[in-house]
Structures are given as C-alpha cells and as structure tokens.
Amino acid sequence: MKFIQLSLIASLIMVAPAVNAAQLISAKEAALPSASGTLATRGISRGPSVKLVSPEADTSVSSPIDFKVHFEARGEGKIDPNSVKVVYMKSPFVDLTPRLKGAISPQGIDFAKADVPPGSHTIRVTVKDADGRETNSVFTLNVTK
C-alpha cells in the first residue's frame, strides 16, 4: 500500500505543470548595440496615458519579472489594443510585440514571468486610442543576476 501511495505521489509530481518563464528579451538581443540618438517622450499629449506598473521604475529586479504596463484613455477615447507596439531599443530595433500579443488588452500589458537577461534594457511602448491619438513612452528595466 505504501508503495502505491509513493508511486502515485511521484507520478503527480512528474506530470505537474512546471512554471516556466517566457522569454521577453534574449541574451543575443541584449548583446546588440544600444540604439543611437535621444530617447525622449513628449511631455504633453492628448493620447492615452502609459504607466509602468511592474517592475517599479528605477528599481533593480531579478529575472523572471512581471512586466505590467497600464493604459488609460483620455476623455471619452478608448484604447485600441491592436495599435500597441513594444520595441526593444537596440540597433537594429527589436519588435517585442509578437511575444506580448496574448498579454495586451485595452487596459495594458500583463506579461507574467518574463525572462530577461541581466543588464539595463530600454523599451518603448506605443499606444493609440480609437481616435488615432498616440503616446510613446520609454522605460528602462534594470535586471540583476
């Protein structure tokens, strides 16, 4: 009887789903040279508000990270989730949008357990509302080992 119980427990452990991190940025992409030029966002915009929720700005975190961005339309506008574009600011630019498609909604981006190599990673998020008003926001993720 003891053997059957141990066998059952062992088989459950073996088939239990593993919690794996999904790759947001590869080590090869992180090794690319940084994009040249000034990375700035406009101060005044009628476009949607874009705010980094997680990880907190100016905070070092270890991978995997929960990458969360909040969108908020201004006035009566509605966010167009199909307009969202996420770019890793390297030379050449790396479009991260396809990796995040399932995590993008009108409320924002919610990508749990994102695998990101150590280093400083600059990401630009572009979003438009239904009226075509656009906002570009640039965030830097600081990831430690």
Q: Where are each of the predicted segments found?
A:
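N-terminal signal peptide c-region/cleavage motif recognized by signal peptidases
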Residues: V15-A18
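Short, compositionally biased P/S/T/A/G/V-rich stretches that sit at domain boundaries
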Residues: A21-I65, E72
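Solvent-exposed loop/turn segments flanking beta-strands in beta-repeat/beta-sandwich domains
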Residues: R74-V86
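Aromatic sugar-binding surface patches on proteins
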Residues: K101-D110
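Surface-exposed, short loops/turns at beta-strand junctions within beta-sandwich domains
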Residues: K113-S120
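Conserved structural position at the C-terminal beta-strand
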Residues: V125-V127
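Extracellular and select intracellular beta-sandwich modules with Ser/Thr-enriched
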Residues: E134-F139
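Short beta-strand edge segments in extracellular beta-sheet folds
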Residues: T140-K145
